[in-house]
C-alpha cells in the first residue's frame, strides 16, 4: 500500500492553502502537526477525494484517486473534524445508515456495527438516541463509523476532540 501526494496544491481564490506538497505514505501511523489554518484539514480532504486539487495529484498504489472512484473510497475510513450526526438516530441506526452509504450488505453491517459499538464502549447505549450522548460518546461513534468498511487507509481529523 502506498499513498503519494505529488506537488499537491489547493487554492481558494487568492489564498493558497497547500502549495506543492510532496509526500509518500507507506503502511504505518502518521500525524499532521501545524498551526491553525496551516492546511491540515484541506490536505486530509484532498486525500479522501472530497476536494479536488488546484494542481498536483494524489495516487493510491500508483493510480490517481480521481480515476479510481468508488474503489478508492471503499479503501478509506474518514472521521472529519466536524462530523454530522443525526440526533434522532440511535447509535445502532446511525452505524447501519453509514454502512448502507458505504455499500455494505445488511447482515455484515449489523455484525460489524455491534462489534464496533463494543470496541468503542457504546454497546450498552446502542439503542439510545445520539442527542443524549456526550461529546466524547459522539466522537467514539464517529470513530466506529470510520472503521465500518475495514479501511486500508484511516484518516482521522482531530479524533480526540471531545474525549
Which residues does each predicted region cover?
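Catalytic Walker B motif of ABC-type/P-loop ATPase nucleotide-binding domains
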Residues: 154-157
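Conserved catalytic motifs of ABC-family nucleotide-binding domains
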Residues: 150
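Conserved ABC ATPase signature
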Residues: 129-133
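Conserved ABC transporter NBD signature motif
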Residues: 56-67, 71-72
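Conserved ABC ATPase "signature" region
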Residues: 96, 100, 107-125
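Helix-to-loop junction immediately C-terminal to a conserved catalytic motif
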Residues: 48
Amino acid at each position: 500500500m502506498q499513498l503519494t501526494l505529488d506537488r499537491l496544491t489547493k487554492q481558494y481564490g487568492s489564498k493558497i492553502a497547500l502549495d506543492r506538497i510532496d509526500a509518500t505514505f507507506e503502511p504505518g501511523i502518521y500525524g499532521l502537526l501545524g498551526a491553525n489554518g496551516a492546511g491540515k484539514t484541506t490536505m486530509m480532504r484532498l486525500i479522501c477525494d472530497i476536494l479536488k486539487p488546484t494542481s498536483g495529484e494524489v495516487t493510491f498504489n500508483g493510480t490517481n484517486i480521481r480515476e479510481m472512484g468508488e474503489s478508492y473510497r471503499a479503501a478509506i475510513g474518514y472521521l472529519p473534524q466536524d462530523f454530522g450526526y443525526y440526533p434522532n438516530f440511535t447509535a445502532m441506526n446511525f452505524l447501519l445508515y453509514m454502512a448502507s452509504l458505504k455499500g455494505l450488505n445488511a447482515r455484515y453491517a449489523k455484525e460489524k456495527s455491534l462489534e464496533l459499538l463494543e470496541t468503542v464502549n457504546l454497546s450498552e447505549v446502542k439503542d439510545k438516541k445520539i442527542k443524549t450522548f456526550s461529546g466524547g460518546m459522539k466522537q467514539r461513534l464517529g470513530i466506529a463509523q470510520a472503521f465500518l468498511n475495514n479501511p486500508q487507509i484511516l484518516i482521522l481529523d482531530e479524533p480526540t476532540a471531545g474525549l
